[in-house]
A protein has these predicted regions:
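Rossmann-like NAD(P)(H) cofactor-binding subdomain of soluble oxidoreductases
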Residues: 19-71
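Rossmann-like NAD(P)-binding element
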Residues: 1-30
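NAD(P)-dependent Rossmann-like dehydrogenase/reductase catalytic/cofactor-binding core
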Residues: 159-175
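Internal alpha-helical scaffold of NAD(P)-dependent oxidoreductase catalytic cores
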Residues: 75-163
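Short, flexible, solvent-exposed loop/turn segments with mixed acidic/basic and small polar residues
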Residues: 72-77, 170-171
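Glycine-rich, N-terminal phosphate-binding loop of Rossmann-like dinucleotide-binding domains
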Residues: 8-10, 35, 87, 135
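Alpha-helix N-cap/loop-to-helix initiation residues
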Residues: 14, 38, 66, 91-92
Length: 176
């Protein structure tokens, strides 16, 4: 009888997972997510909401690293991190309040954007920089992988995020 569900799966599987939990949760439950893109998942949730009285508030904590897996977990990951919520005019205000309270309780600084503005903003400040880092690393590796032996901190800082999961980032790029 869960009344709050947070989906933390790759972008490509969010719709499928959302449909599954939507069917399983009791009426009036609240669902949120941590996906990097919002337009599609919010539209899917609003379509599902037409059939069952559950609420969805899209969420995106701007936190994390290029590392993945349980061994890389950090208790302080969300402290001071911006968390973007993406309600629409159909989102119940009390649902937004509950999700905001959740994120603030773990140290997040909540801001609210509509799904389209969210996707445009994170494309500019997160997705494009990641693509640039990938392209830079790819270019250097194609020139001569030995060049990495003389790379200094600036290059490593610029390309650190290129070490993130290419599968996850492929999904993000395709969705936004």
């Amino acid at each position: 009888e869960a009344d709050f569900c947070l989906l933390a799966t790759p972008v490509a599987s969010l719709e499928r997972q959302l449909a599954a939990v939507w069917a399983a949760l009791p009426a009036r439950a609240l669902v949120t997510d941590v996906g990097s893109t919002k337009r599609r998942i919010v539209a899917t949730a609003e379509g599902l909401a037409a059939g069952r009285p559950l609420a969805f508030v899209g969420g995106h904590p701007m936190a994390g690293s290029e590392r993945a897996g349980f061994a890389e977990a950090r208790a302080d990951l969300f402290e001071g991190a911006t968390v973007i919520l993406t309600p629409t005019e159909r989102t119940p205000p009390d649902a937004v309040t509950r999700v905001r309270s959740f994120w603030e309780a773990v140290g997040g600084r909540v801001t609210v954007l509509d799904p389209t503005t969210h996707d445009r903003a994170v494309a500019a400040v997160s997705h494009l920089p990641h693509l640039v880092a990938d392209a830079l690393m790819d270019a250097v590796l194609r020139m001569d992988p030995a060049f990495l032996d003389v790379a200094a901190r600036g290059f490593r800082d610029t390309t650190r995020i290129a070490a993130a999961s290419p599968e996850i980032w492929r999904e993000i790029f395709l969705d936004n």
